[in-house]
C-alpha cells in the first residue's frame, strides 16, 4: 500500500523521531511511504542512511502534488494541507485517515483509541493512541528489536564512543527540555559515582551551566554527547542504568 505520513517539527526531535521510526518500520515490511515534513534537517544526523521504501518529501504547498495514498497519517494533529485533504475526498476509494496521538498511560487512552471523527467533506478521521495494554494501539517496535537488545554489549558500545564505565559507577542519560530542577538533580547524582551522558541541546546546555567547564561535581562526571542516529539512541538507552527522558523515567 501507499502511505502518506505528515509531520510538523515542533521541538526537541520527538515528533520527527516517532514519524521516522514509523515510516522506516513500514518500509521494512514492504510498504511504500511518503514522509511529508516541514523541517527535515535533523534527519541528516538522525537517519543519514535513509530507509528502504521511504520517500522524504517537503511539506506540500502546490496543488499538483501526488494523489493521496491508501492510508494518510497526520502525526499529533498536524493537519495535512487543505488541498491535499480535498484530493483525499475525490478518490474513488477514500483513504484511511489516521490521527496518530501521543503515547500515554492515562485512562483516557482506552476511551479514545479507535474513535471516529466524521469530517464535513465525507471523510472519517480515526484516532490512534499508542499505549501499554490491549485497549490501546500498542507500541511501535521493529521485529528484531528485542533480539538486538539481548545481543547488545553495553561496554563495547560505550567504548565505540570513546567512553568507559569506571568501577562502581552507574551510567545515566539525560534528554530533557529546560527544567529548573536540573541543578538539584545533578546535586543528587553527585552523591555516588555516576557517569552522566547529556544529549545535545537543552540537556547539555543545562548540565554545563550547572557544573561549569569541568563538567564534574563530587562523584559525578558528565559527558556532552554528539547527536546520535536513531539506532544509536536506542543503544544509549540500553547502555544506561537510568534514563531520564524529558518528563519521565524510562
Model-derived segments and spans:
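A donor-sugar binding/catalytic signature common to diverse glycosyltransferases
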Residues: 20-23, 82, 227-250
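A short acidic, often aromatic-flanked loop/helix-cap motif at beta-alpha or helix-coil junctions
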Residues: 61-68, 105-107, 134-137, 204-205, ...
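A nucleotide-sugar donor-handling region in carbohydrate enzymes
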Residues: 101-183
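Donor-nucleotide binding loops and adjacent catalytic segments primarily
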Residues: 156-158, 164-235
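Hydrophobic/aromatic beta-strand patches that form the interior of the parallel beta-sheet core
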Residues: 34, 57, 73, 96-98, ...
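Short His-Asn-centered micro-motif
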Residues: 37-38, 59, 74-76, 100-101, ...
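Extreme N-terminal starter segment of soluble prokaryotic enzymes
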Residues: 1-4
Amino acid at each position: 500500500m501507499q502511505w502518506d505520513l505528515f509531520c510538523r517539527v515542533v521541538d526537541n526531535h520527538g515528533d520527527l523521531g516517532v514519524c521516522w521510526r514509523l515510516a522506516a518500520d513500514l518500509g521494512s515490511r514492504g510498504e511504500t511511504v511518503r514522509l511529508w515534513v516541514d523541517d527535515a534537517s535533523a534527519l541528516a544526523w538522525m537517519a543519514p542512511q535513509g530507509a528502504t521504501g521511504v520517500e522524504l518529501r517537503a511539506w506540500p504547498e502546490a496543488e499538483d502534488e501526488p494523489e493521496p495514498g491508501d492510508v494518510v497519517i497526520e502525526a499529533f494533529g498536524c493537519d495535512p494541507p487543505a488541498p491535499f485533504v480535498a484530493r483525499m475526498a475525490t478518490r474513488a476509494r477514500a483513504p484511511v485517515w489516521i490521527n496518530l496521538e501521543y503515547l500515554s498511560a492515562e485512562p483516557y487512552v482506552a476511551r479514545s483509541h479507535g474513535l471516529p471523527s466524521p469530517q464535513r467533506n465525507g471523510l472519517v478521521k480515526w484516532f490512534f493512541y499508542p499505549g501499554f495494554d490491549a485497549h490501546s494501539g500498542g507500541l511501535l517496535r521493529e521485529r528484531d528489536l528485542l533480539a538486538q537488545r539481548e545481543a547488545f554489549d553495553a561496554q563495547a558500545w560505550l567504548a565505540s564512543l570513546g567512553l568507559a564505565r569506571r568501577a562502581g559507577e552507574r551510567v545515566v542519560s539525560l534528554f530533557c527540555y529546560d527544567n529548573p530542577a536540573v541543578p538539584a538533580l545533578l546535586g543528587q547524582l553527585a552523591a555516588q559515582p555516576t557517569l552522566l551522558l547529556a544529549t545535545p541541546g537543552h540537556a547539555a546546555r543545562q548540565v554545563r551551566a550547572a557544573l561549569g567547564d569541568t563538567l564534574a561535581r563530587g562523584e559525578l562526571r558528565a559527558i556532552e554527547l554528539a547527536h546520535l542516529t536513531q539506532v544509536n539512541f536506542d543503544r544509549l538507552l540500553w547502555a544506561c542504568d537510568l534514563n531520564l527522558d524529558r518528563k519521565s523515567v524510562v
